[in-house]
Regions:
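Acidic, polar low-complexity linker/tail segments
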Residues: 1-45, 50-60
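…and closely analogous acidic/polar surface helices at protein-protein or active-site interfaces
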Residues: 40-41, 53-87, 106-110
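Juxtamembrane amphipathic/hinge helix adjacent to a transmembrane helix
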Residues: 42-44, 251-265
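Soluble periplasmic/extracytoplasmic beta-strand elements of cell-envelope proteins
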Residues: 42-52, 87-93, 152-156, 181-185
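DG-centered beta-turn motif at the end of beta-strands
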Residues: 48-50, 140-143, 149-168, 185-189, ...
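Second-shell loop/turn segments in exported
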Residues: 57-66, 101-104, 121-129, 239-244
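Short beta-strand-loop
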Residues: 87-120, 143-144
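VWA/integrin I-like adhesion module and closely mimicked acidic/polar interface patches used
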Residues: 159-251
Length: 265
């Protein structure tokens, strides 16, 4: 009896193997491909490189870090967590405009180039010292059109504008139509901190003074240029109470995102 059962099971196993082999042969004739669901993304990474992004008010692994360096970490994490086939462009926001550094490229084929470009992002890339975010997002919309590549815009900024928005310099955004294609990513802390100032050799020389607008034309100020890029010894605050203080202007960015129907994270 036992021998008969074993013989029967052995026959069933051999039959099953033969059927599976036949099915595999049939599948091979049609050259099948396995379809895996991938998270394919396309992002226009936009980084604020204004001087306020040199403020050191974030912490990574128990060590203080500047806003710009924290942004670099975020950029790398976003790229690393995206699948091959995802596309990224790298852009910078300066004053009232946006400049493209790398046009949209596929992640895996251009990984080293993307990482190298992120590592080199810094304040000396700026050609002006002022910061007008409302002008910047309009410029970002034009840049997105010129790149001719559908993508979401991730705008990394602390929201610290110079000059501050008021009734005189406020920009009308009624015609802005990016909506959910734009996401503000707030970078910085809630507590105001002084902003480090560097000279033309990128050496720390002190902190920005609170009088940064005094010598500028116009009642609202403009911080049109930053001589620190060209001077070995730019002026700095001489006392703690003279320092210009900066923070993450989260409420302003949230208000702005609601106004143009975009997102803030």
């Amino acid at each position: 009896m036992i021998a008969a059962v074993i013989k029967y099971l052995s026959y069933k196993v051999e039959l099953t193997i033969m059927i599976l082999a036949l099915l595999l042969c049939l599948l091979a004739m049609y050259n099948p491909t396995l379809q895996f669901k991938k998270s394919i993304t396309s992002y226009m990474l936009l980084v604020d490189v204004s001087q306020s992004m040199n403020a050191e008010d974030l912490v990574v692994e128990d060590s203080p870090i500047t806003r710009i360096n924290y942004t670099k970490i975020l950029l790398k994490q976003i790229i690393d967590k995206s699948d091959c086939g995802s596309f990224f462009s790298i852009n910078i926001f300066v004053a009232d405009n946006v400049a493209n550094i790398i046009e949209p490229v596929e992640k895996c084929n251009n990984y080293d180039e993307l990482m190298d470009t992120i590592n080199k992002l810094e304040w000396r890339m700026a050609w002006k010292g002022n910061s007008r975010i409302t002008f910047g997002i309009k410029s970002a919309a034009k840049m997105q059109d010129s790149l001719n590549f559908p993508s979401k815009i991730l705008f990394f900024t602390d929201g610290d504008e110079a000059p501050k928005v008021n009734a005189i310099n406020r920009v009308n955004l009624d015609d802005f139509n990016l909506g959910e294609e734009l996401i503000f990513v707030g970078v910085g802390g809630d507590t105001p901190v002084p902003v480090k100032r560097y000279n033309s050799r990128n050496m720390y020389v002190g902190y920005w003074g609170s009088d940064i607008y005094d010598s500028l034309p116009g009642a609202t100020g403009s911080r049109n240029s930053d001589s620190g890029k060209d001077e070995p010894d730019p002026s700095v605050a001489s006392a703690d109470y003279e320092r210009y203080l900066s923070k993450l202007y989260e409420e302003y960015l949230i208000s702005l995102s609601e106004q143009i129907k975009s997102q803030y994270i």
